[in-house]
Amino acid sequence: DFLFCLKAHRSLSHEIGKDWGESAERFSSAAQVLSGKRQLAAILIQLPFRFSYTAENRVYLGDLISALDGFPLVVEFRNEFWYQQRVFDELAKRKVCLAIIDRPELPGLPPESQVLTSDRVYYRLHGRNSTQWWNGDATSRYDYEYSPEELKDRARMLAAISRKAKQVLVAFNNHADAKAVKNARSLEGYIREFQL
């Protein structure tokens, strides 16, 4: 019962070119291998802060979701302007999960919303390193270790939200110095302790 969560290739999220359709086809073919074996839990489309809420980006995202239709999709927005009811409604209509993200509280970043747009919850913990978020590199930005109190709070939140979902997926992205592994083990322990 081992499941995989894939992250969409950066050619579909961070470095979108005119040939993105070909990239989507290649990615879809690769993902189909896991999907066909019922080992694909989700495909994360993580969109960067600069992917702002514009008409062009809305059309692109709709086209990308259509290109990956049939897969269990999760969208993670890093820009607060995507957090509005019309976006939630469209994701729900297409059965696309809106990722719940834990991140530093900084201007421009989305709120930690617990809006469910599908029967799946995808909770991604990036750490709360506010001093490195905008100026750090891919390692220092996520260099953060959650405290036991923070993880207990997350476990309680997951318990509450899991009552509304068929599947709950949790991913730690605070990967510097293996903090993600340590925090994931701790969270698992709290979930068991609280009998969630």
Annotate each PLM feature.
Residues 1-196:
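Residues lining hydrophobic/aromatic ligand-binding pockets adjacent to catalytic sites
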